[in-house]
UniProtKB/Swiss-Prot annotation:
Residues that span the membrane, as ranges: none
Predominant cellular place of this UniProt entry's protein: periplasm
Native organism taxonomy: Bacteria, Pseudomonadati, Pseudomonadota, Gammaproteobacteria, Enterobacterales
Gene3D superfamilies linked to this entry: TolB, C-terminal domain (2.120.10.30), TolB, N-terminal domain (3.40.50.10070)
Region forming the signal peptide: 1-21
Protein name, as recorded: Tol-Pal system protein TolB
Subunit structure: The Tol-Pal system is composed of five core proteins: the inner membrane proteins TolA, TolQ and TolR, the periplasmic protein TolB and the outer membrane protein Pal. They form a network linking the inner and outer membranes and the peptidoglycan layer.
DNA-binding found in the keyword field: no
């Protein structure tokens, strides 16, 4: 927890730009079929009202995962604060085999103790599956709640939780001197802040694997430029500003390289920069357009979009040489892929019969599953644990963010109130 707090502390440097118009998750499909679970409001052991609803945060996280359906508070058979107070039969009668209980206690120094227990209602009374406690200051209460959610989620699913992650996205506001903003928020839309404001378009944010930097495209110099911004202090490093197009940045998983697309020689081609030396080398060539790189886990292989066969399709290629291999064959065109951290599957924008949706392709079997059902879907980005995809779609006259689980069952929107939202990028674990 202490290490995680140190990693996240850099974001506080930018909180002076926190905005009141935030995005919030609105679930549209899939919770009813998820596993039921009990999450009891955490007992507040101080005067007045609790400073944060930790139990509510845990319940929302588990619901947002698409894998759990927390029992509505009005239906809770009891409100225990400890495992010893849980009456297993009261919960099992409702089909619930796991209950989260906890307490929030204020300390004299202004900090708070957060404690939780995950209780098995199918075992002997008081059987604890997982438990932990944290001492945090007020500004880290939500983070502590997400930490508890991560631990509960992993214990029950065997999958690492991703509730302490963030998303970056571009917002085009309605006028003003700087109508384009690159923003970052918690995965659930809370704690939103502005990373960069610009009078010109901003595009294609991409996270470094340690979560400390964002690469993105800016047009402030009068032409496109690729930059890397350090979130803790706001410092900006220009990576590429060649004639024509500079775009589609992607950090390698080992953090040593940045792949991107340039059209300085005519067609779009892929290049890779060694971030330590600044040396750039060309990876693809020819007359076809090659863009939208995404890395495989080995940090040596790229998947990318190419029109070498006519329409855009996804190919893969080792950056040290060899021929590109086409890996998408279903649909009229496929593009803008994001490979999972284990390299077993990818998500992409797939077009067929005039429809443009987010699809998942198994990289072992080649099987394809369409995940989304929204309109003109684009720019999919995977959560680091591979369970969820965030993407943008058209709605009305604007663009909004959406979530869909990688099994296609859970769907949600993240509507914003102050502009069009696009180009989402899900952070690594923080």
């Amino acid at each position: 927890m202490k290490q995680a707090l140190r990693v996240a502390f850099g974001f506080l440097m930018l909180w002076a730009a926190v905005l009141h118009a935030e995005v919030r998750i609105e679930i549209t499909q899939g919770v009813d079929s998820a596993r039921p679970i009990g999450v009891v409001p955490f007992k507040w052991a101080g005067p007045g009202a609790a400073p944060e609803d930790i139990g509510g945060i845990v319940a929302a996280d588990l619901r947002n995962s698409g894998k759990f359906n927390p029992l509505d508070r009005s239906r809770l058979p009891q409100q225990p604060a400890t495992a010893q107070e849980v009456q297993p039969t009261a919960w099992s009668a409702l089909g619930i085999d796991a209950v989260v209980v906890g307490q929030v206690t204020p300390n004299p120094d202004g900090s708070y103790n957060i404690a939780y227990q995950l209780v098995d209602t199918g075992g002997a009374p008081g059987t604890v599956l997982a438990q932990n406690s944290y001492k945090v200051n007020k500004q880290w209460l939500r983070y502590a709640g997400h930490t508890a959610s991560d631990e509960v989620f992993e214990k029950l699913t065997g999958i690492k939780g991703a509730f302490r992650t963030r998303i970056a996205y571009v917002v085009q506001t309605n006028g003003g001197q700087f109508p384009y903003e690159l923003r970052v928020s918690d995965y659930d839309g809370y704690n939103q802040f502005v990373v960069h404001r610009s009078p010109q378009p901003l595009m294609s944010p991409a996270w470094s694997p340690d979560g400390s930097k964002l690469a993105y495209v800016t047009f402030e110099s009068g032409r496109s430029a690729l930059v890397i911004q350090t979130l803790a202090n706001g410092s900006v490093r220009q990576v590429a500003s060649f004639p024509r197009h500079n775009g589609a940045p992607a950090f390698s998983p080992d953090g040593t390289k940045l792949a991107f697309a340039l059209s300085k020689t005519g067609s779009l081609n892929l290049y890779v920069m060694d971030l330590a030396s600044g040396q750039i080398r060309q990876i693809t060539d020819g007359r076809s357009n090659n863009t939208e790189p995404t890395w495989f886990p080995d940090s040596q292989t790229l998947a990318f979009t190419s029109d070498q066969a006519g329409r855009p399709q996804v190919y893969k290629m080792n950056i040290n040489g060899g021929a590109a291999q086409r890996i998408t064959w279903e649909g009229s065109q496929n593009q803008d892929a994001d490979v999972s951290s284990d390299g077993k599957f990818m998500v992409m924008v797939s077009s067929n019969n005039g429809q443009q949706h987010i699809a998942k392709q198994d990289l072992v079997t080649g099987g394809v599953q369409v995940l989304s059902s929204t309109f003109l879907d684009e720019t999919p980005s995977l959560a680091p644990n591979g369970t969820m995809v965030i993407y943008s779609s058209s709605q009305g006259m604007g663009s909004v963010l959406n979530l869909v689980s990688t099994d296609g069952r859970f769907k949600a929107r993240l509507p914003a109130t102050d502009g069009q939202v696009k180009s989402p990028a899900w952070s690594p674990y923080l």
